[in-house]
Amino acid sequence: MQDPASHSDSLVGRVEVKETTCYMCACRCGIRVHLRDGEVRYIDGNPNHPLNKGVICAKGSSGIMKQYSPGRLTQPLRRKAGAERGESAFEVISWDEAFAMLEERLAKLRAEDPKKFALFTGRDQMQALTGLFAKQYGTPNYAAHGGFCSVNMAAGLIYTIGGSFWEFGGPDLERAKLFVMIGTAEDHHSNPLKMAISEFKRRGGRFISVNPVRTGYSAVADEWVPIKPGTDGALLLAITREILDKGLFDRDFLVRYTNAAELVIDDPSRDDHGLFYRAEMHVEPDCFDPQNKLWWDRDIDGPISTHTPGADPRLMGRYVLPDGTPVKPSFQLLKERLEQYTPEWAAPITGIPADTIRRLAHEMGVMARDQKIELPIKWTDCWDDEHESVTGNPVAFHAMRGLAAHSNGFQTIRALGVLMTVLGTIDRPGGFRHKAPYPRPIPPCPKPPHGPEAVQPNTPLDGMPLGWPSKPEDLFVDAEGEAVRLDKAFSWEYPLSVHGLMHNVITNAWRGDPYPIDTLFLFMANMAWNSTMNTVEVRKMLVDKHPNGDYKIPFLVVCDTFASETVAFADLVLPDTSYLERHDVLSMLDRPISEFDGPVDSVRIPVLPPKGECKPFQEVLVELGSRLKLPAFTNADGSRKYRNYPDFIVNYETSPGSGIGFLAGWRGKGGDQFLKGEPNPHQWEMYAQNNCVYHHELPRSYQYMRNWNKGYLHWARAHGMIRYAEPITLHLYSEVLQRFRLAAQGKRPGRQPPERLRQRVETYFDPLPFYYEPLESRFTDTQRYPLNALTQRPMAMYHSWDSQNAWLRQIHSHNYLFLSPKVGLAQGFADGDWVWVESPHGKVRCMCRFSEAVEPGTVWTWNAIGKGAGAWGLAPNADEARKGFLLNHVIAEELPAHEAGEHLSNSDPVTGQAAWFDVRVRVYKAEAGEPEVTSPQFKPMPRLPGQEKKRGKWQAYVAGIFGKQAS
């Protein structure tokens, strides 16, 4: 091998280092891309980036192989005339032809019935733009992948504490002493969390992981607590009961910062039963909780306005107000609810011994009580009380999809929020800390459209396609209480479906329920494979026809970077760029990368020109918005407003003159303003000069207690993050849920649920968290199907993005079913055998591996490693297709017909969260002589026009050999 130092610059070639933001997962680390003669040769972490500080993972460094993947789409494609959908029979067309097709079709739909156009996207990180496009077009049928991912986590915590894990908050491991992680796979939060856990353990912190599987983060935990899937709520409620019984809750925190002491009307005969008693009745603003409630003061032994100086409210007891109204503090109601949830009750449900549950509760409670943190930071609360320091209780939690992806996930996550609250850990040192733009009011201000009248020809929606209902009047239903959206979000079936129900879109569109559509536009959403449930049947729906020969879903547009399984079914294919070829924003209007100490947003700036005819999806939307003359994309005379996407990002404002746009940094003509300021024509250049990231560090006095921090709330209002500088009281007791329950009981005027759904709403909209068995288990013979089945993301793969990656395939080219040896022993098969995994909905054949690191009643596998033959540029006989498998084949997207409806989604009844972890299976050995290949198999997908036929010279590159010798 030759020494590169001995070569001249002319032999080495032109070497450049360019900075941008990674997109190999949702972590969005800063990266440096090293190029030689315009080709990517190395990617490393940017040491000057506040998020990852130079650290990079296997995914991030493998972005080279994503860039040069043979799975790349490079030209717009149209299904050939006479060819059947699903056959991948395409012809190349120009972008002018593609835009003309879309403009003609979408303009006609917008002029006649905008809801016949549906736009659904995957993990795209640009929902502020896609949501804006849908609103401006006038279609309610829009959502991203959240309903399929972790909407229960977002909704469950935001409706409880005003913020959530992941982008909007997380564990303060810098100061925590006890860290409890529940239901979190290896991909979530990635580098920053790994770095934080490493430092936490070096400082002697104790790490407990609660998970059915011990992989990834759990493997480095001090204690692994295996739990049966879907029973986390039972554990959390039992722990909370123990903490209350032992008096280990933070009374001062509960009184001052939560609704624990607020008096709730306790008279089931009244129509306002379960609502807070209000000292004055008036029309409430849309999005803050007025401080017009009462406490029961122990000194005067009577009612008093909340936060009266010197008041000492009671948390327990039953009282009668002077007007005869019986009331209880909401904490009393919580305590009564928890009486049934003993450790002995929870033990057989969770598989965790009662003594362990008691020990965990004691450990959390004592740590929070006895190891308090005090920081010398002065701050002033909303009631003008000045504090000399910020205090904290050093117990931190982190949780994700393991809790969320169940039909009981919303109430489970409400239970987690209540536990975190009674321990006094919210936005305090060592506990949970918010990230801008959160905290927000409970619930946040935006609301969905209110009814069918919101959808009008050639008119934007009167609300956002997605929002945060606070009462039945906020639902998006017709006069009969039935859904207006295609996915039935914001209907009485799933009232708080704040992220939509992507997983039911194809089924509903195929059935024409609640109505037929014309055009389904999918971006980066592999909805014919791993981004759906009941995959075999969904693929059939995409090709199903009416008796007259027309497709039941008339027109399908797919925009993607790669030849995914879904591309085969498209009528029109739009080739997206890679993340190294485009401008992109990770915006405060969307899902930013903020830190605990203040807002952070970032950008991607092209380091390479687009491959072939690829065009960024963002450019596609700006172009379509201009052609369709959508108001946000055009001037008053209908002329085009923005040259392109970068111009749109610089000059767009949320309202004329608001000074608030997609990017927070370097605003104002001279780039000297932040968060709010007039457009800066040099904004992109300033981001490029500053590591592609903007980090605004708040004053220390604004960094904690932000729900009630006067300085922070006024700052947040001034910079457009919230509308009102009002305290954001934590909701131990949810009056929002009680309003829906009262409507279901017929005790509330206005919108009422259809009769078939009254019992469903009354049951699941409980204002206090409760545990119930996952819905699918009620319709499944659990004796025949005794095992829970799960998937999780491996550390080296993210969704289905990376199975075409030449480097990462060497780590995961196929997946196994992992299970306890006890299952194999009972069923007569051995480690490595071919087995069948069967549910009531379908079955898959795969190879198994025994593992002691799994709860004995659970089987699991890596998600999205299995691929359809020929997809993603892989050979039809690739391991991903022959040995890899997809568990989605055995998961139903709908529940069996029952009293609440014939076609209810297999989802959480509150949020519509896909319940893909609820599935029950049995596992048995494949018969001798069966093919040693996974099942089901599908017809191989041929290589598409524009895909590379062979791998380029870049894959033969050897470090240390430069210039022409490497070619």
From Swiss-Prot:
The keyword Cytoplasm does not apply. It is found in: Cell inner membrane. It catalyses: a quinone + sulfite + H2O = a quinol + sulfate; a menaquinone + sulfite + H2O = a menaquinol + sulfate. SUPFAM superfamilies: ADC-like, Formate dehydrogenase/DMSO reductase, domains 1-3. One of its GO terms (cellular component) is plasma membrane. It is an enzyme of class 1 (oxidoreductase). Its cofactor is [4Fe-4S] cluster; Mo-bis(molybdopterin guanine dinucleotide). Transmembrane segments: none annotated. It comes from the Bacteria. GO terms for molecular function: 4 iron, 4 sulfur cluster binding; metal ion binding; molybdopterin cofactor binding; oxidoreductase activity. Residues 15-71 form the 4Fe-4S Mo/W bis-MGD-type domain. InterPro entries: Asp_de-COase-like_dom_sf, MoPterin_dinucl-bd_dom, Mopterin_OxRdtase, Mopterin_OxRdtase_4Fe-4S_dom. [4Fe-4S] cluster binds at C22, C25, C29, C57. Gene3D superfamilies: 2.40.40.20, 3.30.200.210, 3.40.50.740, Dimethylsulfoxide Reductase, domain 2. It is a peripheral membrane protein. Its EC number is 1.8.5.6. Binds 1 [4Fe-4S] cluster. Pfam families: Molybdop_Fe4S4, Molybdopterin, Molydop_binding. Disulfide bonds: none annotated. Keywords: 4Fe-4S, Cell inner membrane, Cell membrane, Iron, Iron-sulfur, Membrane, Metal-binding, Molybdenum, Oxidoreductase. Part of the SoeABC complex that catalyzes the oxidation of sulfite to sulfate. Belongs to the prokaryotic molybdopterin-containing oxidoreductase family. PANTHER family: DMSO REDUCTASE CHAIN A, TUNGSTEN-CONTAINING FORMYLMETHANOFURAN DEHYDROGENASE 2 SUBUNIT B. This is Sulfite dehydrogenase subunit A. It comes from Allochromatium vinosum (strain ATCC 17899 / DSM 180 / NBRC 103801 / NCIMB 10441 / D). The lineage of its organism: Bacteria, Pseudomonadati, Pseudomonadota, Gammaproteobacteria, Chromatiales.
